[in-house]
Amino acid sequence: MPKRLDINTILVIGSGPIVIGQAAEFDYSGTQACQSLKEEGYKVILVNSNPATIMTDTATADKVYIEPLTLEFVSRIIRKERPDAILPTLGGQTGLNMAVELAKSGVLDECGVEILGTKLSAIEQAEDRDLFRTLMQDLNEPTPPSEIIHNLDEAYGFVNEIGYPVIVRPAFTLGGTGGGICHNEEELIEIVTSGLKHSPVTQCLLEKSIAGCKEIEYEVMRDSNDNAIVVCNMENIDPVGVHTGDSIVVAPSQTLSDREYQMLRNTSLRIIRALGIEGGCNVQLALDPYSFQYYVIEVNPRVSRSSALASKATGYPIAKLAAKIAVGLTLDEIVNPVTQKTYACFEPALDYVVSKIPRWPFDKFESANRTLGTQMKATGEVMSIGRNLEESLLKAVRSLELGIYHLELDHLKELDKETMKKRIIKADDERLFIVAEAIRQGVTKEEINEWCEMDFFFLQKVENIVNMEREVKANVGNMEVLQTAKEMGFSDHYIAAAWNKTEREIYDMRKENNMMPVFKMVDTCAAEFESATPYYYSTYADENESIVTDRKSVVVLGSGPIRIGQGVEFDYATVHSVWAIKEAGYEAIIINNNPETVSTDFSISDKLYFEPLTIEDVMHIIDLEKPEGVIVQFGGQTAINLAAKLEEHGVKILGTSLEDLDRAEDRDKFEAALTKLGIPQPVGKTATTVEQAVAIAEEIGYPVLVRPSYVLGGRAMEIVYRQEELLHYMKNAVKVHADHPVLIDRYMVGKEIEVDAISDGENVFIPGIMEHIERAGVHSGDSIGVYPPQSLSEKLKEQIIEHTIALGKGLNIVGLLNIQFVVFKDQVYVIEVNPRASRTVPFLSKITGVPMANVATKVILGQDLVEQGYGTGYHPEEKEVYVKAPVFSFAKLRSVDTTLGPEMKSTGEVMGKDLTLEKALYKGLVASGINIPTHGSVIITVADKDKEEAMEIAKRFHEIGYNLLATAGTAQSLEEQNIPVQVVNKIDSEDYNLLDIIRQGKAQFVINTLTKGKQPARDGFRIRRESVENGVACLTSLDTTRAILRVLESMTFSAHSMKEITQTKRHEVVHA
């Protein structure tokens, strides 16, 4: 049926900040949906709290609201805008939960708003574990034996009947939050308690564990006419028991017989029809490898992480079509945008293999528990495409950017068989590498299958790779062996090491022998129809399908997988850069490997290469395309790290030159440049040995800030207060030597300021200056940022502007630069300069209306700032106040300390904007998930060095009517200041103690700045973790606490007796 004409305005709900379980895939689906609805002539209103997205650009929708995704704010927008309908199914779990909340509150009925796409009843049937189980029983679809529970007693009842292990799945949660597998009573108590807490309806499904079955996913679409198709089916290499977001996934499925494939396909279609879903939907199934017995695990009645992967794997744009279906169009009316000839009701066919490997944050969090289970832990993922599974897997491995070029890790070589067995049974992020190591050491496929039930087909593929390694090592210099190895996806890096040559020598050897890859097109139809998409992958085959045009081209390097420190902000900059290249009349080519992002949507660039970002893979494309040059500024550290190698290959780096990039990153050169420019910086030196480090720290004086050079996201950065901590750091955090020096700086406790600027070498334009609420020492990505700065004097601002202009010109920056300053005793010091796009580019671009990545790209391509209408100087400040607040995923990562410091820990960000700082802060904090009740209790436990400062904070909490709780030491200090306080027992007390108060929800805030110590056993760590597990705001910085107090004070009316008021007035007269 044709599209609906009875609705005009549609409100699209975004997915909010990036957290583990909900990453950039919703920026991609939301952006697609908004464009798709606008194409059909609807007025689109978007609400989302995440400023780092393409989706929240003003051009994406007719009206964009960057506001908290809470009932209070979304209801306000609905009442103001009066949309005819809302579309929640493209905003992930956040969007779905919001729709349910809006419907229950009555605001949709009150304003006459209907829910498009998937009806509320279908959302509830799929998300509510009880209703879903009933529906499956009605359809005669098998589900594992299970029971809905609402408390621990009911859980015991089920386990007594069915036995361990059992899987706990909380209702209405994201990425398996709060769930897990229980093997014994202790785990049952812990996981069920946590699951009930995380479920908004206090409901969990307990099911008999079917771990060990194959996990298969079907991505299906259905329209209002009941046409339904399978877009893509995928198979998890890891059997059931590991969350699909943490599994290595291949598409299409590799081990299903036709009968199994058709059986599961029919089931998936039957379920989507029974639920009445209109749009995209993801069905997860478990298949017993030894019989035709299968189980339905769950259904996501929305666009999901898997649908982003399916879209990129097949080229079939699910979100775009789901939006069209939501407004009444049917699959046989929608033209497939890939072929532009066939209709969307054709099921895609693949003539290649796609692999997805998750990217975990364990390189950042050494203390995290690396075991994988039903609760997701990955922050992002990479995808690769090959003609065979071996090639596809090895390309994915080198896309992860962990410095790994092959399916082997040096530190696993020492493992004995028993350790390998344990780790393969348990499943962690290195399982596939351990499987390869076990095969190298002669463990049979039968044994490995017995340990982890990974299918023999996949084990055979790993064995093929291991056998090929032996061939390579035994046949040094043999061209035929080299050809076979390349067809299997082996990297030059690996072959060079085996043949004792350099990577460059192998590359040149292949070039001489015409052993270069060709590029194949992703066309959704296995080349049956001609395709109009410029979307390519490399492989070693005969025919090259990537036609080089005679237009001048520019290559942009993307930023790879989403991880802590390198989030969606860099993808935002990449996309804007590509658009600017097109506007300037060049052909824009993008190289990236992240299936979740907007940049890897084939409609963004003129050509998209889905490839690993390694020197070998990038050079293959450059050799073919021969571009004018490569832009590395927008791909975060990933792209910057490739610059030197590209230049060695004779490739032109556009924008800031390699020499100037190096001057900003290399400590000694940078110091020399600052001295020459007369710009002060904290005293600091470089150490290349442990002894040197100790001597430097003594000379500068503690506390010192230590870090390796060339890092992103403050990896392995620490503030050290005494010598033993320094020695611990030098031994455990870094391997120091001449090539990898460690920087040691005087740590200044001052106000941190961040500036983004654009320079063309002559002019330097500054769109905005941001002030951090947390003082220097907390990573800028984890600080609350405020624009415009609220407490800088005009004199300091002028100093900052002067320094920024001097640095832009003095370092010969062409393009973007980001500078971090610290204000200490009324003097401005430079902490660091990053000659590239920063995390704050999207935030400042949205606020100031200066499209920074676009302007910078045009500068890089030779159009100076004056030609573009900008000159040297500072952009006029906006009237409103904007706050950027960090969002953390601690609830998903047990045993990670939540204390903020110089190493970045947040996964995402939100924006709050309003007329005053307090209101903007309120929005930012609420959007980031912090509850701000106007009364209640606050627990204060602070280190001795913070006691004095904490007194003033405690007094203010008391003034607004908060009840203060503290352990003996802190309580004594409070009593001395005449501040009423209730003493609570320390956590090692057998009696009712501090942790019990947190567990029972009797504290609204916990302020905890306990002594530094990296061993998690410390008291402070336990207090902080308990707060996270129980959803209580735990503040580890007194600056953040002050910000929250400002908000609370602005929300509460003061209450003083008349006597108090007159007494203070009398004192004023006396002292006059």
Curated annotation (Swiss-Prot):
GO terms for molecular function: ATP binding; carbamoyl-phosphate synthase (ammonia) activity; carbamoyl-phosphate synthase (glutamine-hydrolyzing) activity; metal ion binding. Mn(2+) 2 binds at E298, N300. Mg(2+) 1 binds at Q284, E298. Residues 930-1072 are annotated as: Allosteric domain. ATP 2 binds at R707, R746, E752, G777, V778, H779, S780, Q820, E832. PROSITE patterns: ATP_GRASP, CPSASE_1, CPSASE_2, MGS. InterPro entries: ATP-grasp (IPR011761), ATP_grasp_subdomain_1 (IPR013815), CarbamoylP_synth_lsu (IPR006275), CarbamoylP_synth_lsu_oligo (IPR005480), CarbamoylP_synth_lsu_oligo_sf (IPR036897), CbamoylP_synth_lsu-like_ATP-bd (IPR005479), CbamoylP_synth_lsu_CPSase_dom (IPR005483), MGS-like_dom (IPR011607). Residues 930-1072 form the MGS-like domain. Mg(2+) 4 binds at E832, N834. The keyword Transport does not apply. Residues 133-327, 671-861 form the ATP-grasp domain. Mg(2+) 2 binds at E298, N300. Mg(2+) 3 binds at Q820, E832. Its EC number is 6.3.4.16, 6.3.5.5. Mn(2+) 1 binds at Q284, E298. Mn(2+) 3 binds at Q820, E832. GO terms for biological process: 'de novo' UMP biosynthetic process; glutamine metabolic process; L-arginine biosynthetic process. ATP 1 binds at R129, R169, G175, G176, K208, I210, E215, G241, V242, H243, Q284, E298. NCBIfam families: CPSaseII_lrg (TIGR01369), PRK05294.1 (NF003671), PRK12815.1 (NF009455). Large subunit of the glutamine-dependent carbamoyl phosphate synthetase (CPSase). CPSase catalyzes the formation of carbamoyl phosphate from the ammonia moiety of glutamine, carbonate, and phosphate donated by ATP, constituting the first step of 2 biosynthetic pathways, one leading to arginine and/or urea and the other to pyrimidine nucleotides. This is Carbamoyl phosphate synthase large chain. It comes from Bacillus cereus (strain ATCC 14579 / DSM 31 / CCUG 7414 / JCM 2152 / NBRC 15305 / NCIMB 9373 / NCTC 2599 / NRRL B-3711).
